[in-house]
């Protein structure tokens, strides 16, 4: 399956938060003009990308072009001269200025190094800084994808039910692997689903992911509200893998309508949009709420009947609609699981029981102790860079 012209341009590359913003036209001619300056005896090369300094090992050669901006920095496409492949390099500037951001970077590195799956983005390299003592910027090299689902859905690229099936299947196939490693992604949304022109899909941006037994729930970052499950909106502390399935349901609805399903302006509005579609939960659906206050709050909200999905999604195939109704369930314990979703008739033509691998070992993030300073994290990331580049570059 292909998309015409790679679908919608813009690259949402691995951008932490806010998804990267594709560059839209206007710079085509300028791309060739970004010239590199060799530094450190020719072992590194420095590029000035529209005022952003980009210093990478000299095996990364032009053409260099900016493909996205995340909350944490700029992302450029550049060529690895040794493999002749184009890669994406994310610069995280001043990565060790505060503990939360430093830990987020470390977490993404450790998680993606642990994982190996077609539908999960992989890290190809971590650039070894020229000097350990001046190590402030982290450069992570990923495989390059052409675009992301957010940009594709906002483009005028026609999409069929086959596209929808294939995207959904790949998200679930990747998520099965992620969940089998005891990891919850927690931030699935269209801009974190990376695509190429062949419609291959990879899950990106694991900066907010958590293992299932970690309990610092949701303290440091606000996950995009629109894709957030009811139990997160209601501050439920014991959430499960079902939070990611809710997000996949929101994404499935958005693939078909090309509009966000629940674009809440604040969390009260968010809950209202959800209950207007799936109906207000009855008491038997509130067992997951440990807090009486939360239960009282939900009961005090305006009550809505469940909407007919056929009326809301007139163009959606009946298979997709049935799966969507099983994903958008208020009670997380009654929501379809990733394994059940892969077995759903809607995905029967793609489902391949022996080709949906799980992760051989659970991931554990051993760096949560509060005593870990920014300097400690810098040392751990430095060692990760040395694993990719054991020898100093001569």
UniProtKB/Swiss-Prot annotation:
Q: Which reaction does it catalyse?
A: L-seryl-[protein] + ATP = O-phospho-L-seryl-[protein] + ADP + H(+); L-threonyl-[protein] + ATP = O-phospho-L-threonyl-[protein] + ADP + H(+)
* Residues bearing PTM Phosphotyrosine: 221
Q: Where is the composition biased (Gly residues)?
A: 1-31
Q: Which gene encodes it?
A: MPK2
Which EC class does it fall in? transferase
Residue ranges annotated for the Protein kinase domain, each copy included: 61-347
Name the SUPFAM superfamilies for this protein.
Protein kinase-like (PK-like) (SSF56112)
Q: Where does ATP bind?
A: 67-75, 90
Please give the biological process terms from Gene Ontology that the record holds: intracellular signal transduction
Leader sequence range is none
**GO function term, MF aspect, one:** protein serine kinase activity
Name of the protein in its database record: Mitogen-activated protein kinase 2
The EC designation for this entry is: 2.7.11.24
What Pfam families does the entry give? Pkinase
Consult the record and explain the modifications the protein receives after translation.
The phosphorylation on Tyr-221 activates the enzyme. A conserved Thr, which must also be phosphorylated to activate the enzyme in closely related sequences, is replaced by Met-219 in this sequence.
Q: Is Cytoplasm one of the keywords?
A: no
Mention any one GO cellular component term assigned to this protein in its UniProt record: cytoplasm
Q: Which residues form the active site?
A: 187 (proton acceptor)
UniProt record similarity statement: Belongs to the protein kinase superfamily. CMGC Ser/Thr protein kinase family. MAP kinase subfamily.
Residues annotated as region Disordered? 1-33
Instruction: Report the induction information.
Output: By infection with rice blast fungus (M.grisea).
What CDD domains does UniProt report for this protein, alphabetically? STKc_TEY_MAPK (cd07858)
Originating organism? Oryza sativa subsp. japonica (Rice)
- Note the superkingdom of the native organism: Eukaryota
Question: Keyword annotations for this protein?
Answer: ATP-binding, Kinase, Nucleotide-binding, Phosphoprotein, Serine/threonine-protein kinase, Transferase
InterPro entries from the entry? Kinase-like_dom_sf, MAP_kinase, Prot_kinase_dom, Tyr_kinase_AS, Tyr_kinase_cat_dom
